[in-house]
Amino acid sequence: MSGNSRATRLGDRIKEIVATMLERRIKDPRLGFVTVTDVELTGDLQHATVFYTVLGDAEELASSTAALESAKGLLRSEVGKQTGVKHTPTLTFQLDATPQNAAHVEEALREAAARDAEVAALAATATYAGEADPYRRPAVDDAGDSADDADPAEDERPS
């Protein structure tokens, strides 16, 4: 939607009007379970794109799309009556791709989790290629002092 608040408010109002009309006033038997997800308006408020989703298979999607196209005039006139704008925006219905995109992302996350589990299983049974601790540590004698810290001159003095 454009950046101005009037377009945002009008888009929200159009979304409410169209959703209410589809639920209560449109009696087309081809119309399935349609959900209006968003409305985007052009900057001049002349064209509104109504995004929708349909619950069901491809046949229900096709019949609901045809029902929306046939009810477009009635919906536009009702939008004009209820919004009171000088020029009622034209309505264009477009299937919302968000559910398909979400399903694709979820599938990618499932694949990544499966790969992570596979790598974790391999890492649990893996052995080090070299020593377990490859870093050099100073040698420690029995007194708890490291051999590097001891002064060699002290060891050579007679007691």
Swiss-Prot record:
High-level lineage: Bacteria, Bacillati, Actinomycetota, Actinomycetes, Micrococcales
Any single Gene Ontology cellular-component annotation: cytosol
Keywords: Cytoplasm, Ribosome biogenesis
Gene Ontology molecular function, alphabetical: ribosomal small subunit binding
Main location (coarse class): cytoplasm
NCBIfam families xrefs: rbfA (TIGR00082)
Purpose: One of several proteins that assist in the late maturation steps of the functional core of the 30S ribosomal subunit. Associates with free 30S ribosomal subunits (but not with 30S subunits that are part of 70S ribosomes or polysomes). Required for efficient processing of 16S rRNA. May interact with the 5'-terminal helix region of 16S rRNA.
Name listed for the protein in its UniProt record: Ribosome-binding factor A
Keyword Cytoplasm: yes
Highest taxon listed in the record's lineage: Bacteria
Keyword hit for Cytoplasm: yes
Disulfide linkage: none
Example of a GO biological process term: maturation of SSU-rRNA
Entry's family note: Belongs to the RbfA family.
Quaternary context: Monomer. Binds 30S ribosomal subunits, but not 50S ribosomal subunits or 70S ribosomes.
Subcellular localization: Cytoplasm
